């Protein structure tokens, strides 16, 4: 029996390696796609870079959710947010609006700008805040203490308004410097296009951006690629991230792996 189990494991590994190898050679998928296949709840995130989107066509490609860029800093609105928000809302996708965090603006002002721009979120996914380096910030990272303070103000203001902790999207470098140990009770959406976060962030992530060079049908912008993501839980657990009409939400983080 033990030898049979070992043989089965070896064969499974060989099949997986073969599939991944074919995908690499044909450039249809990257290695991460093999591992992301273990999480069937799949989604995209988009901004004006994808240009005009045919949401009916896009949503029909085995997708469950979409995060749409709404705001950046304390005064910028994505030029395609209103159109994307309206049209995506006519599909069966779970949709959410994300904010691109600025290291150069007041966190409270950024939250207020998001609230004014996006409005009520009844039936939609809770807010997401994208925290990543931009410009020369990676080479010269913003002060840790001040960044944590401003990000806290932004997140707390959003939670106060919408009744639910926002999702934090981030990269590994930013996670290690600002997020880890400070915002552990917030849902984590981690970017890792190289390997599964299950290897070093097991039990800490809920969303995983596993690819940034995917090509789907249904959009025609300056950017030919689109980001692909998976949710760590089931579709029913994803539904727990929706804002209900009363604004009252469960305190726990569903779908944690």
Enumerate the language-model features and the residues they cover.
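Functionally critical loop-and-helix segments that line ligand-binding/catalytic clefts
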Residues: 38-51, 56, 183-257
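Substrate-binding cleft of extracellular glycoside hydrolase catalytic domains
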Residues: 31, 36-53, 68-153, 159-161
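Sec/Tat-exported extracytoplasmic proteins
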Residues: 62, 70, 89-92, 118, ...
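Glycine-enriched alpha-helix->loop->beta-strand junction motifs that scaffold or abut catalytic
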Residues: 62-65, 92-93, 123, 182-189, ...
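N-terminal Sec-pathway targeting helices
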Residues: 1-19, 23
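Hydrophobic single-pass membrane-insertion segments
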Residues: 21-31
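Catalytic domains of cell-wall/extracellular-matrix polysaccharide-remodeling enzymes
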Residues: 126-201
């Amino acid at each position: 029996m033990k030898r049979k189990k070992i043989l089965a494991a070896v064969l499974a590994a060989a099949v997986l390696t073969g599939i991944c190898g074919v995908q690499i050679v044909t450039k249809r998928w990257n290695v991460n796609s093999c591992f992301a296949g273990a999480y069937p709840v799949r989604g995209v995130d988009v901004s004006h870079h994808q240009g005009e989107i045919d949401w009916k066509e896009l949503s029909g490609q085995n997708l469950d959710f979409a995060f749409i860029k709404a705001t950046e800093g304390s005064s910028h609105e994505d030029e395609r947010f209103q159109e994307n928000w309206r049209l995506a809302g006519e599909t069966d996708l779970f949709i959410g609006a994300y904010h691109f965090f600025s290291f150069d603006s007041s966190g409270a002002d950024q939250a207020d700008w998001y609230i004014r721009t996006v409005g009520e979120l009844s039936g939609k996914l809770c807010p997401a805040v994208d925290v990543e380096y931009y410009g020369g910030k990676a080479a010269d990272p913003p002060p840790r203490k001040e960044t944590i303070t401003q990000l806290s103000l932004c997140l707390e203001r959003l939670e106060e308004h919408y009744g639910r902790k926002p999702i934090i999207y981030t990269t590994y470098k930013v996670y290690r410097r600002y997020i880890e140990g400070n915002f552990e009770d917030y849902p984590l959406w981690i970017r890792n296009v190289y390997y599964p976060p299950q290897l070093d962030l097991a039990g800490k992530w809920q969303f995983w951006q596993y690819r940034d060079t995917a090509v789907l049908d249904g959009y025609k912008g300056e950017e030919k690629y689109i980001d692909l993501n998976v949710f760590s839980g089931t579709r029913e657990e994803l539904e727990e991230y929706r804002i209900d009409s009363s604004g009252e939400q469960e305190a726990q983080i569903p779908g944690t792996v």
